Amino acid sequence: MHMNLEAFILGCGGMVPLPHRHLTSVLLRREGELFLFDAGEGTQVSLRRLSLRWKKISAIFISHTHADHITGLPGLLMLSSQVARSEPLYIIGPPRTAEYVETSRRILDMYINYEIIVKEVIEPQVVYRGKDFQVRCFCLDHTKPCMGYTLEEQDRPGSFDPRAAQDLHVPCGALWSQLQSGVAVQSAQGVTVYPEQVMGPARPGRKVSFVTDTKYLQSIAAEVRNSDFFVCEGMFEKGMEKDAAEKKHMTCVQAATIARDARVRLMALIHYSPRYTDHELKRLLKEAQRVFPHTILSRDQLMVPIAYRE
C-alpha cells in the first residue's frame, strides 16, 4: 500500500528569528497524521501559511530546551484547544521538557481541553510507535541535553507475482488480495498456498532523520544511516570548525560528511546562523555539495515529498 509522506520546513533559522526565517521546526505528514520536530518561534505562522491542520498533530518531538527550539510550543498548545480534539497530544523531549510545559500552562493560565502526555528521555530508545512505523531518539552533544530523532517505517511486502499464483492454481480475485495481505489461502486443488510463494522480497519502508543542535559526532552517521530525508544543522561555513566545536554546533561540511557516510538519499541543511544572508547561504550549500551532492537548503514553507525506494 502506498502512503504519502511529506516533510514541511516550518522554520529554518537558528538563534534569533528573521523576517523571512522563522526558528527551527520541521513537520512530517504521513497519510494525514502530523508529527512535529521542534517548535521554534513562528511555527504557527508557517502552519497557517501551509494550511496544515494543527489538530492532526499526534506528537511533538523536542530536541532540547533552548529557546529557539521551544518558544513556539505554548502557542501551539493553546491553539489546539480552539478546535475539537479528542486524541491526546504526546510531547517527547529531554529533561525539563515537562517542567517547561507545566510552567507555561500555569503562568499563561492556559485553557486546555485535551490530554497532554509528556515523556522525558535521556538515552536512545523508541519513543513513539504507530501501526507500521516508529520514532526513535538518540543522544547528541550540545550545551544541554539534546536528542536527535528518526521516523522509520516497517518494511513493505514484496511485489505480488500473478504468474506464480496462477501456476499454483489460485484463482484471481479475493484470494490474491489475501495473499498480498500476508494470509495463506487454499488453491483450487485444495493445496495451501503461502504468501512467500507468490510475493517477492520485502521492500524497505522510508526513514526520515532530524539532527540539531550538536557538535560533529561520527556516531550520528550510524543513527541516520539510509535515511531517505535527513534534516541536519549546518550552522556555520567551512573554516569555522573551531568555533562550531566550542559552541557545540556543526559546519555545513560536517553535516555533509555525516550524510555521505550514512548514505542518505537527500539532506536539507537547517538552523543557519543569522549572520548569513540568503545569498551567503548559497556558499554554504556549495561547500556541502562538494562533499555530498544531494544537499539542499531548507527554507521556510518548503515541502519535500519523500518517495519509496523501489
Swiss-Prot record:
Organism in which the protein naturally occurs: Treponema pallidum (strain Nichols)
Protein known as: Ribonuclease Z
Name of the coding gene: rnz
Family: Belongs to the RNase Z family.
GO MF term (any one): zinc ion binding
UniProt remark on cofactor binding: Binds 2 Zn(2+) ions.
Enzyme class: hydrolase
Residues given in the record as Zn(2+) 2 binding sites: 68-69, 213, 271
UniProt KW keywords: Endonuclease, Hydrolase, Metal-binding, Nuclease, tRNA processing, Zinc
HAMAP family registered for this protein in UniProt: RNase_Z_BN (MF_01818)
Cofactor needs: Zn(2+)
EC number: 3.1.26.11
The keyword Zinc appears for this protein: yes
The protein's assembly and partners: Homodimer.
Residue positions binding Zn(2+) 1: 64, 66, 142, 213
Coiled coil ranges: none
InterPro entries: Metallo-B-lactamas (IPR001279), RibonucZ/Hydroxyglut_hydro (IPR036866), RNase_Z/BN (IPR013471)
PANTHER family from the UniProt entry: ZINC PHOSPHODIESTERASE ELAC PROTEIN 1
Primary role: Zinc phosphodiesterase, which displays some tRNA 3'-processing endonuclease activity. Probably involved in tRNA maturation, by removing a 3'-trailer from precursor tRNA.
Entry keyword annotation includes Ligase: no
Catalytic residues identified in the record: 68 (proton acceptor)
Catalytic activity: Endonucleolytic cleavage of RNA, removing extra 3' nucleotides from tRNA precursor, generating 3' termini of tRNAs. A 3'-hydroxy group is left at the tRNA terminus and a 5'-phosphoryl group is left at the trailer molecule
